[in-house]
Amino acid sequence: MKLYLVPTPIGNLEDITLRALRILREEVDVILAEDTRTSGNLLRHYSISKPMSAFHINNEHKVVTSLAERIVAGERMALVTDAGTPGISDPGFLLVRECLRLGAEVECLPGATAFVPALVNSGLSADHFIFEGFLPHKKGRQTKINEISKNHYTTILYESPFRLVKTLQQLAEVCGNERRVSVARELTKIYEENVRGTLEEVINHFSQKEVKGEIVIVLEGIEKE
């Protein structure tokens, strides 16, 4: 019958919408979750009790067709991820595509996505930007970094805390130490941190501490000649 894409908080549990709570409580038969333990804890916090099924990067290719067929046959499902909006650097695209192919209705609720507050809060231009998500770990990584260095638009990246300094150093090698950048860490959480400055300044900041949490990098574009 219908697939709902339901964003969940990226940290602060007050950031879920009233509509999202209503959909999860009243409008669906099954909740598809990236991690049923994580989402289970979230749902219990909001006093929501619904059957759950795992849908993640390791099984989505195997189950996507059967799930879409069940939705077409009349089931109402919601897809949630551990944090943020499904399909944004998280599972979701394959299921949406298959549901649309089979004629099922798909509805996406507006809600939390980490890169939006990171961009708006960066002090860098938000008129035109490119969201790259996570960089490749190996193959194609340097090629992508070289491409990013030539962007005239602001570029947004997700990164793990363990690779943050390395990624900033690689960007500095091709962009120059003076390119401006903003790094948002643990957005909406108690220890939220926003560090803005040149690549050199931000590298120095994070090189002196153990980095933890979810990371968003917002990189200034080069000026058009």
Predicted regions and their residues:
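A contiguous loop/helix-start segment that scaffolds small-molecule binding in enzyme catalytic cores
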Residues: T154, Y158-E225
